[in-house]
Amino acid sequence: MDYKSKVAELIKKHVELEIEAIEKLIEIPPKPEMGDYAFPCFQLSKVMRKAPNMIAEELKNSMSTDGFERIENLGPYVNFFVDKGVFAENTIKKALEDGENYGASNIGEGKTVCVEYSSPNIAKPFHVGHLFTTAIGNSLYKMFKKEGYNTVGLNHLGDWGTQFGKLISAYDRWVDEEALEKAPIDELLRIYVKFHEEAEKDPSLEDEARANFKALETGDEKATALWTRFRDLSLKEFERVYNILGVKFDSLAGEAFYNDKMDVVVNELKEKGLLVESNGAQVVMLEEYNMPPCIVLKGDGASIYATRDLAAAMYRKKTYDFHKCVYVVGTPQALHFKQVFKVLELAGHEWAKDCVHVGFGLVKFADRKLSTRNGSIVLLDDLLREAVEKTMEVINEKNPELENKEEVAKKIGVGAVIFTYLKNSREKDIVFDWKEILSFDGETGPYVQYSYARGNSILNRGKECTGTVDYSKLSSKEEFELVKSIANFNSVITLALDKLEPSILTRYVIEVAKGFNKFYNAHSVLNLEDEDLKATRLNLVKASLQVIKNGLELLGIDVVEKM
């Protein structure tokens, strides 16, 4: 058990609050002299009808100090000072015993969480914006799993719409079969762009495209075969990119999957008297909720995104009976999801409150020097390739004899990019600056990976140590601060999931790496006459690395053993 839980259980014996509520109230004091954990008593004053200061004093006097150095009250706070030796022993032992499971809990046992993320459009290339949803969603997916939830990763592919009618027309006229097999997305994009250029000169192409899409909607054999081919070729290409990123999904049910599930939604909304006609379209009025109408059917009877998202939500609830369904989609779609969730609520689905939109910002470049295949969008392939190439330049300059250079460059380069996406609050825009991203100093992915490799080197050189571990020897400020950081791992994961904010975990991993380097720079680990102290510090190094490795894994980043 971590000390935060121990503090919470101690308080629980004396107050009428649930353990989860107590844990959320517990704070880390700003100064070490104020204790290691603090419990504010403001919330109890209404219930207990006493001043917070008085409650704090009463709690302090009634608590056992077993496992603590001391417990004090300071104003409205109860401050807990842990027994450093016992604390270090409990924390480090748990980290080493749990290994890759350190930080895990069973808080989500028996509950299912759906996470929708990535969701690219078929026949279009991944651009840098796609990595935002993919990185955030992948990290949330991994964290929910770590907390014991049955987690379902959903890739809601953009695999339906009028663009497929255009693609069929373009395919019939201009496709290069060899290019299509070799680089499918590039070729499909080329003929799609060509279609728009030609349609400006010959508007009848648009009519033909509409007819093609109508044929696809009615199950025409040729149109369906081409659509299936476009989808399969695109998925193969997407899979290649997902493999580079180490991302997997449990379902690839895209927009097309819900084609036969939308009539049920429309009929339900009609039966419940929610659908009204507006300018020929069928809409749900949301004016009293300060939102524009939610269009369910267009004037020509065609469905739109909202209809599909309503159908998807209902299908997911029926199929997975989710505890929570998280949609990782850009912030500009916030209104769309508010409308969809409100329509679900008005239709009587109380579980609409369990649907959550997780928005994120834009991706910008500090110098726009990233090489691209066209001026308007930066392709993800180009970004990742350049990251790996620039990392290789650094390796060749600093350690040209390094083994497995290509593999190391890939892990550091791709990891640096993912780390940048997850470093700051997700709603903030990202500004890419290669110099900063690939720096081995500061708050970057390479800095954290370098810290891990540095620690690994220490462990390899300390293998012959014969000392006996004695945690009471870890008495310095740097050692204790590092142990405290290690102990906070599970609380950080819980908070990151509570806020649906992976950057909380990213900042924590940086904090552990910094704490490890601070400790190592202040204290010798290997050059010690005291073998027992050496053995104890080696265990502290091992526990630090376990946390860094587990933390990076939850962010979707690999560690590098040597660099």
Curated annotation (Swiss-Prot):
Gene Ontology cellular component annotations, sorted alphabetically: cytoplasm
Pfam families hit by this protein: Arg_tRNA_synt_N, DALR_1, tRNA-synt_1d
Reactions accelerated catalytically: tRNA(Arg) + L-arginine + ATP = L-arginyl-tRNA(Arg) + AMP + diphosphate
Cytoplasm in keyword set: yes
Keyword Metal-binding: no
Record InterPro entries: aa-tRNA-synth_I_CS, Arg-tRNA-ligase, Arg-tRNA-synth_N, Arg-tRNA-synth_N_sf, ArgRS_core, DALR_anticod-bd, Rossmann-like_a/b/a_fold, tRNAsynth_Ia_anticodon-bd
Subcellular location: Cytoplasm
Family stated for the protein in its record: Belongs to the class-I aminoacyl-tRNA synthetase family.
Subunit structure: Monomer.
Protein name per UniProt: Arginine--tRNA ligase
Annotated source species: Clostridium beijerinckii (strain ATCC 51743 / NCIMB 8052) (Clostridium acetobutylicum)
Lineage: Bacteria, Bacillati, Bacillota, Clostridia, Eubacteriales
